[in-house]
Amino acid sequence: MEEQDPKTPSRPDREDSTTAEGSEQRLGHYLRMLSDENPGNRWKAADSLGRLKDPRGTGPLIDALFDDDVRVRVKVAWALGSIGDPRALGPLRQLYRMERQDQQEIIGEAIEAITRTMSGE
């Protein structure tokens, strides 16, 4: 069995993820990781929340949108676009105006994804 780095939060058991309780545990785990001191863990949390596409992640992701680490901010923007919740549009537009051009591209894609979701495309 692989030994876990004590600084990396453990991941919920994959077998549990098929049950409603397991899904709740996974969601809670990733939401807690969004505030981890390690930016790599915050990035992983945003990535996982974007893949889950659970709208309950929208509020915490919006809160994480202005993270100190640019890689985390961009991944959070991607996750919000993946979820497609229109509540993220205002904060994403604000972040878009603040970031450099290379980050603006990904943030713009997230805004477009949410706009498409809203229009039913």
Which residues fall in each region the model found?
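N-terminal segments that cap or nucleate solenoid repeat domains
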Residues: E3-L52, G57-P60
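Amphipathic alpha-helical scaffolding segments comprising HEAT/armadillo-like alpha-solenoid repeats
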Residues: A20-M33, D54-F66, D85-R97, T117-E121
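Short inter-helical turns and helix N-cap capping residues of alpha-solenoid HEAT/ARM repeat scaffolds
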Residues: E37-N38, D68-D69, E99-R100, Q104
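Conserved hydrophobic register position within alpha-solenoid helical repeats
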Residues: A45, V76, I107-I111
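Long alpha-helical HEAT/HEAT-like repeat alpha-solenoid scaffolds in very large eukaryotic proteins
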Residues: D102-E109, A113-M118
